[in-house]
Amino acid sequence: LEQHGLSGALRGFKKAIQRMNAIEYDRSQPRPRVLIVGEYLLNFHPGANHEIERYLEKNGFEIIEARMTDVIRKTYFCQDEQIRTYHLKKPFVKKKWYHVANRVFDAAHAAADRIAKQHPLYTPVCRLPELVKESDPIIPHTFDAGEGVLIPGEILHHAEHGCRAFVILQPFGCLPNHVVGRGIVKKMREMYPDAQILPLDYDPDVSFANLENRLQMLIMNVKERCVDTVALPDAGQRSPVETMNRKQKNADNKKQKVS
């Protein structure tokens, strides 16, 4: 993008999709899906979240990730919606800027969608204006503190499309995200009683073992309750969790024999 501009970025994206089309995949046994949402630095930085995506993938999940562009766009969109909904008086230039910014995001997403549709597994995502309005039963879509309505909006949208496992990442002591993260869990569970919603607090002293214990509870609950209505391993197959535990047990037995 820096060297070749927008046209170069689009060409690079097309090449990436072409290379992905050459990768073989097997969808005969769909994995249960889990949505990861929360504070955006934790959400998108593997070092900060202890590579939670890789861990859940190793344990048999298909990851649904939130979109970084929605985090950037949220402020422009919410300001524009607040002006329209509450009839706020703002300078004309500022009103126009919010409107233009939203149009630019729409154009960029449309261009990316046209290219990404060349991959057979690509599903166009819900655009921000429709996504955030999913949260209205819980939090008005004009709310803009912390991650705003992105967390409830994402969860409700994917819950309506069959996902039943959700992980909310939040820094310990981040009050706005505790309101729109942990604070919405009770209402979410009332709306979707079979949903597994796990808020995870991160701080500098938290160990991965602590996080792993809570993640394993989510993994086992998904396996036992068969959430997400997909074919989980039957009695004749070992689940990824069982396989991992069996490998660890064999390794421990070998160590004991050597000693």
Each language-model region and where it sits:
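An N-terminal assembly and electron-transfer interface module characteristic of large anaerobic redox
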Residues: 1-259
